[in-house]
Amino acid sequence: MAKKVQAYIKLQVAAGQANPSPPVGPALGQHGVNIMEFCKAFNAQTQQLDAGAPVPVVITVYNDRSFTFTMKTPPAAYLLKKAAGIKSGSGEPNTKKVGKVTRAQLEEIAKAKEPDLTAADMDAAVRTIAGSARSMGLDVEG
């Protein structure tokens, strides 16, 4: 018989840095999940990613307190800031520009985000990422 799903927990955890402190510990603890088991499994799967990159994760908790989790790609804003070499986006994106990204960089980010985007084709994915860049105060070249 299939296990019954008890809860879905959505978190954003730094790659390779999951530990029992908040936000991971309380979110998993209230559902009775073995927190250290999740931390070890998550850190093992995120070893190849940039250390500290925020990774969205969806944890499925079953009624027997077992769990599975699926990781998504880092947020577009994080990837754009990394590509532009900036710490944070603009507070006034329409007037203050804080950096530039090229079409090639947008294509690279769109390719990385492809599994999580709902775009019909690659061009639509690039336009989606370009819109995110503009809303952060980045100039889009090309």
Curated annotation (Swiss-Prot):
CDD domains: Ribosomal_L11. Disulfide bonds: none annotated. SUPFAM superfamilies: Ribosomal L11/L12e N-terminal domain, Ribosomal protein L11, C-terminal domain. Keywords: Methylation, Ribonucleoprotein, Ribosomal protein, RNA-binding, rRNA-binding. InterPro entries: Ribosomal_uL11, Ribosomal_uL11_bac-typ, Ribosomal_uL11_C, Ribosomal_uL11_C_sf, Ribosomal_uL11_CS, Ribosomal_uL11_N, Ribosomal_uL11_N_sf. SMART domains: RL11 (SM00649). GO terms for cellular component: cytosolic large ribosomal subunit. HAMAP family: Ribosomal_uL11 (MF_00736). This is Large ribosomal subunit protein uL11. It comes from Alcanivorax borkumensis (strain ATCC 700651 / DSM 11573 / NCIMB 13689 / SK2). The lineage of its organism: Bacteria, Pseudomonadati, Pseudomonadota, Gammaproteobacteria, Oceanospirillales.
